[in-house]
Amino acid sequence: LKDSIKAGKRVRTETNLGTGAVSISSAAAELALMKVESFDDCHIAILGAGKMARLLVQHLISKRANKITLLNRTIKRADELAAQFGDVEIATGTLDNMLETVVAADVVFTCTSAVEPILHRENLEPCCNGSQTLVFDIAVPRNVHSNISAIEKVFAFNVDDLKAVVAQNQESRRQMAMEAEALLDEEVEAFIDWQ
């Protein structure tokens, strides 16, 4: 048993096997953090309150996000999701307040079940105040029209951008798994020699 624990510890300390986002929601949170450097004073808006939003909130909280606003078509669903994270204060509202919330946010994540884009240049540009906004569209079909990239200081990322990050991280994990396997083989040989 002691040797098993030792082998596991070697894998954790000598490889980065558990690092790197391998889901779209974790990749979105990871990429957002790379772009803003810290979530300490970052206002984050999440549009949608389904499974993807729940996973996203988990990843954001694990990265120390503490200023989160969650909007949904129905306030009940937004409140229910926010209540699952009782140790973090999450503001809630309906999508009726979407544009005001998006403009006030530093980072926006969209993950609604809308079948048409809900954010586009025509509805967002008149509201923009000139501050930088990062928009991560993790919905399928897309919630954000590609034309919002034409708005000054609005930077949009979509599922395709995030899939590239996920694929890169999955390949990296495969490499690390091979390294971990080699370490475990060494530990098995040492154990066999000991017996």
Q: Can you describe what each PLM-predicted range is?
A:
Residues 112-114, 139-140:
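Short glycine-/small-residue-rich Rossmann-like dinucleotide-binding loops
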Residues 19, 23, 47, 73-76, ...:
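Conserved active-site and cofactor/substrate-binding residues in soluble primary-metabolism enzymes
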Residues 54, 79, 117, 142, ...:
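Alpha-helical elements of the RecA-like P-loop NTPase motor core of helicases
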Residues 1-39:
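Glycine/serine-rich phosphate-binding loop and adjoining beta1-alpha1 elements at the start
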Residues 125, 129-134, 138-195:
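Adenosine-phosphate binding glycine-rich loop
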Residues 29, 33-105:
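Glycine-rich phosphate/diphosphate-binding loop of Rossmann-like nucleotide-binding domains
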Residues 54, 58, 100-106, 115-136:
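Rossmann-fold NAD(P) dinucleotide-binding segment
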